[in-house]
Structure formats: structure tokens, C-alpha cells
Curated annotation (Swiss-Prot):
Source organism per UniProt: Photorhabdus laumondii subsp. laumondii (strain DSM 15139 / CIP 105565 / TT01) (Photorhabdus luminescens subsp. laumondii)
GO MF assignments: glycine hydroxymethyltransferase activity; pyridoxal phosphate binding
Cofactor(s) this protein requires: pyridoxal 5'-phosphate
This protein's name: Serine hydroxymethyltransferase
Cellular component aspect of the GO annotation: cytosol
Catalysed transformations (reactions): (6R)-5,10-methylene-5,6,7,8-tetrahydrofolate + glycine + H2O = (6S)-5,6,7,8-tetrahydrofolate + L-serine
Function: Catalyzes the reversible interconversion of serine and glycine with tetrahydrofolate (THF) serving as the one-carbon carrier. This reaction serves as the major source of one-carbon groups required for the biosynthesis of purines, thymidylate, methionine, and other important biomolecules. Also exhibits THF-independent aldolase activity toward beta-hydroxyamino acids, producing glycine and aldehydes, via a retro-aldol mechanism.
Length: 417
């Protein structure tokens, strides 16, 4: 018999110590990785529930196992909330991750060797949009598009590449682009050659849910997202569509299960359901507006301090610092800021002279600091501290001084009060 008082702390102290140290790290470090966020205790309650015990291959009302009457309710809640939140008429909440959601879309609609047009990883795209080191770049013939001299997506280039190469699918979405994407323009280009428009909105899903960023669902044939990042839910994936194409929906469902996955993670789907409900609250809209405002505030400080921001602005939750002119590598910037308890990630910039393991840039995002309660004043102060570190990247006295300021503001704005 299992007893509810069983715990990790007494049974596996080695593991528990690492878990507790991670709690301390999150509380005492400022998190600026654009893809990271803090999920609510309600989501964690769902993920730690007995739903983890239940196998439920299939879909609500059409399972291959018995005993699914209650997990059917859980999954249907998640489906209905996803559709309502994003204005879709189809939702699949089973993908274990954004990458698996993308894989399911490709497998549903493409054959190996088909041509796809996706954003160049070096210009802000994502691994699953055709990077040669990813399955998407190995299975399909990839034609990349990128940004122009101003740092904005070059739609004329997309149109020209589409006309020349006749891809079966055009992919919209990004992992490091700070502008607004014209989804209607991308659909127009896709329609001009009879291609699917597939949008991966993983990074901006929370902003879209709150009306802060344009919604691709009315324009794209298929949309995927993660459920974490700006959406602030559990780690997982989601597929959406609109337009009433039941054959497309059947293909997508079959591609997820049994095509790419077996049993769904019902405890995670419960977490998704909770997060989707939270995303419908007025407080969530206010949070997303603050995320965007904080990013703009940080950009203003970096520009005023003489740092180059790719495209010179941000229209979402993230931006890229280009450190080429400062003769600082992304790797060194990442490490120095880390010593000050400020967590970022090194990131390639357009036409980067350094390798992806070194890079010449840093990606910065504001979802996590905003979740702590930071507003523009704190965001500006933080950006100033980061400039102080980067201006004195080999001065450990300065870095330690900034670290103490970081510890103080983290204590003032705890992640979990």
C-alpha cells in the first residue's frame, strides 16, 4: 500500500537537495531567458496529481482503454478552453512539446523530400523550422528566408522564394524575432502558390491570448504553440486550426496519435486546462501588456547606453542584443551576467561571425521578471545593471556589487510568496 506521507526528502536526500537548490536558484536569480516563465501553483498541483497514473490512448469518447470517463472530462476542458482562447474550431492538446506538435503537423501534411520555406535559425527562426541539425532539416527540402537590413522580416524575399521554389508549406513563427509578423501577408503568399501556411506561435501565445500581439489562427491553415513560455502553463504542446476542414483535423489527430505519440500525459493536460483558464482572466491580460511594456523599457535603456538591439526595437516580449561592436561574445556576456545572478542565453545574431556555441549576441525576454511583479521602473533599473556588467565584464567587484542588488530585488519580488 502506498502512503501519502511518502516524500522525496527522507527517501532520496541527494535528489531532494538538487531540487531544493533549484528552488533557491529561481528565487535568487533574475530570469531573462525569453522561453522561460513561472507556472502557477495550480498548474503544479495538476501535474503532481494522480492523473499521472492513467493511460488514455485515443481521444475523448474514443479511447483504447477503459476507465477514461474522468480524464475525458479533463481533456475536453482543455480542448474547449484552447479553442475559446484563440478563436479556433479545432484543438489537439496532446502533444508532449512544441517540437512534437510541429513534427505531427509535418507528418500529417508532408512527404519526406517535400519543400518547406522557413525562417533561417540565424535570423531568429527555430530548430524545427528546417535547421539542418533537426529532423525537419533532414526529412524535408528546406529553403530559408530571413530578415532585411532593418531587422524586419523581408516579405518580398519570402514571396520571391515561394514563387521560385514552390514549397508545399510556408512556416511562420520564430524563437528570436522582436517584430510583429504580418500573418495576412504570409497567407496571401501561401495562397499565391497553393501552399499550406503553418504558424508556430510558441513564443507569443500568451501575448496573442491577451490581444497584445496579432492572432495567426484566422489566417493560418494550422497553428502550433507550446503551453509554457508567455502562456505560463506546463511544458507541453498544442495544435490549433480554424476553417472547418474536418479532413485536415482528422489528419492532424491521427498524426499525433498514433502517428507520433502513444498515451497522452493526462496530468500535463490537466495543467494545460488550468493554465488556459488562467489565461482568460483579466489579470492575465494586464500581465501580458506589462510583459511588452517591460521589454520596451529595457530596450530604451540599452539603446541609451550605446548597445545595439537587432531591429532597434521590440514589439513583443523579447529582443536581441548584438554585441559585435562591443567586441564581447554572447558566451562571455552570458557567463558574466550569470555571475551577477542574471540569467540570459547567448544567441546568434544576423550575419554572426562567431559559431553557435560562442555567438555574438544575447537574447533577453521579460515574461519571468514580469511574473515576479517587475514594472517599467524595475525593468529599466535591471537593464542598467546589465549594462554595468557588460561595460565592466572583467571587473569582479562590479559584478559582485550588481549581484547584491539582484539579491535584494529578488527578495523584494519573490517568485512564490
Amino acid at each position: 500500500m502506498l502512503k501519502r506521507e511518502m516524500n522525496i526528502a527522507s527517501y532520496d536526500p541527494e535528489l531532494w537537495q538538487a531540487m531544493e537548490q533549484e528552488v533557491v536558484r529561481q528565487e535568487e536569480h533574475i530570469e531573462l531567458i525569453a522561453s522561460e516563465n513561472y507556472t502557477s501553483p495550480r498548474v503544479m498541483q495538476a501535474q503532481g496529481s494522480q492523473l499521472t497514473n492513467k493511460y488514455a490512448e485515443g481521444y475523448p469518447g474514443k479511447r483504447y482503454y477503459g476507465g477514461c470517463e474522468y480524464v475525458d472530462v479533463v481533456e475536453q476542458l482543455a480542448i474547449d478552453r484552447a479553442k475559446a482562447l484563440f478563436g479556433a474550431d479545432y484543438a489537439n492538446v496532446q502533444p508532449h512539446s512544441g517540437s512534437q506538435a510541429n513534427a505531427a503537423v509535418y507528418m500529417a501534411l508532408l512527404q519526406p523530400g517535400d519543400t518547406i520555406l522557413g525562417m533561417n535559425l540565424a535570423h531568429g527562426g527555430h530548430l524545427t523550422h528546417g535547421s539542418p541539425v533537426n529532423f525537419s532539416g533532414k526529412l524535408y527540402n528546406v529553403v530559408p528566408y530571413g530578415i532585411d537590413e532593418s531587422g524586419k522580416i523581408d516579405y518580398d524575399d519570402i514571396a520571391a522564394q515561394a514563387e521560385k521554389h514552390q514549397p508545399k508549406m510556408i512556416i511562420g513563427g520564430f524563437s528570436a524575432y522582436s517584430g510583429v509578423v504580418d500573418w495576412a501577408k504570409m497567407r496571401e503568399i501561401a495562397d499565391s502558390i497553393g501552399a499550406y501556411l503553418f504558424v508556430d506561435m510558441a513564443h507569443v501565445a500568451g501575448l496573442i491570448a491577451a490581444g497584445v500581439y496579432p492572432n495567426p489562427v484566422p489566417h493560418a491553415h494550422i497553428v502550433t504553440t507550446t503551453t509554457h513560455k508567455t502562456l505560463a502553463g506546463p511544458r507541453g504542446g498544442l495544435i490549433l486550426a480554424k476553417g472547418g476542414d474536418e479532413e485536415l483535423y482528422k489528419k492532424l489527430n491521427s498524426s499525433v496519435f498514433p502517428g507520433c505519440q502513444g498515451g497522452p500525459l493526462m496530468h500535463v493536460i490537466a495543467g494545460k486546462a488550468v493554465a488556459l483558464k488562467e489565461a482568460m482572466e483579466p489579470e492575465f491580460k494586464a500581465y501580458q501588456h506589462q510583459v511588452a511594456d517591460n521589454a520596451k523599457a529595457m530596450v530604451e535603456v540599452f539603446l541609451a547606453r550605446g548597445y545595439k538591439v537587432v531591429s532597434g526595437s521590440t514589439e513583443n516580449h523579447l529582443f536581441l542584443l548584438d554585441l559585435v561592436d562591443k567586441n564581447i561574445t554572447g558566451k562571455d556576456a552570458d557567463a558574466a551576467l550569470g555571475r551577477a545572478n542574471i540569467t540570459v542565453n547567448k544567441n546568434s545574431v544576423p550575419n554572426d561571425p562567431k559559431s553557435p556555441f560562442v555567438t555574438s549576441g544575447v537574447r533577453i525576454g521579460t515574461p519571468a521578471i514580469t511574473r515576479r511583479g517587475f514594472k517599467q521602473a524595475e525593468a529599466r533599473e535591471l537593464a542598467g545593471w546589465m549594462c554595468d556588467v557588460l561595460d565592466n565584464i572583467n571587473d569582479e567587484v562590479t559584478i559582485e556589487m550588481i549581484k547584491q542588488k539582484v539579491l535584494a530585488i529578488c527578495a523584494k519580488y519573490p517568485v512564490y510568496a
